[in-house]
């Protein structure tokens, strides 16, 4: 579902849960609903990429399920999990910019209200540049952290 449609679709639920459907607080429910399935799918992919032989050897050595999760699955998938967090954060930046279009506040609201509606190209350029910088910083930090967990 395109996020802008999800935003509008979830207005009644947001109103019910939070008591308001606009502003930064009103954007929390749609952002959460959009981010959770994305993140869980990415983590699922990371966990599925673990070599089954590693898991099999942990089971053969008699490790309990909680121990396998803690000592095998999470460490083996940590690189992918951190990359998943990074990608989810980048998508949340994009989603939050779209939330500004429907009154969610933030940089998207600034771009629409002062850039688009007032035909202020300078403001539009600045908001686009700020979003690009924010995404690049997020990507750089995520890559820097995930490098520490990369398996050769």
Give short role names for the model-derived ranges.
Residues 8-38, 123, 127:
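Loop-to-helix entry region at the N-terminal start of transmembrane alpha-helices
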Residues 1-6:
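Transmembrane alpha-helices and adjacent helix-loop boundaries
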Residues 125-152:
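C-terminal transmembrane helix and the adjacent membrane-cytosol boundary/short C-terminal tail
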Residues 65-96:
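Transmembrane alpha-helices
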Residues 94-130, 150:
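Glycine-rich helix-loop "coupling/hinge" segments at transmembrane-helix boundaries
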């Amino acid at each position: 579902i395109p996020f802008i449609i999800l935003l509008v679709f979830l207005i009644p639920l947001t109103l019910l849960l939070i008591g308001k459907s606009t502003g930064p607080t009103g954007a929390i429910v749609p952002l959460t609903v959009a981010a959770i399935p994305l993140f869980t799918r990415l983590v699922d992919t990371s966990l599925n990429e673990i070599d089954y032989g590693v898991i099999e050897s942990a089971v053969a050595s008699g490790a309990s399920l909680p121990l396998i999760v803690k000592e095998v699955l999470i460490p083996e998938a940590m690189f992918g999990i951190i990359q998943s967090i990074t990608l989810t954060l980048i998508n949340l930046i994009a989603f939050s910019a779209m939330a500004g279009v429907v009154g969610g506040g933030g940089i998207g609201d600034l771009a629409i209200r002062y850039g688009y509606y007032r035909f202020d190209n300078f403001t539009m350029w600045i908001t686009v540049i700020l979003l690009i910088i924010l995404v690049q910083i997020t990507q750089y930090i995520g890559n820097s952290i995930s490098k520490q967990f990369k398996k050769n």
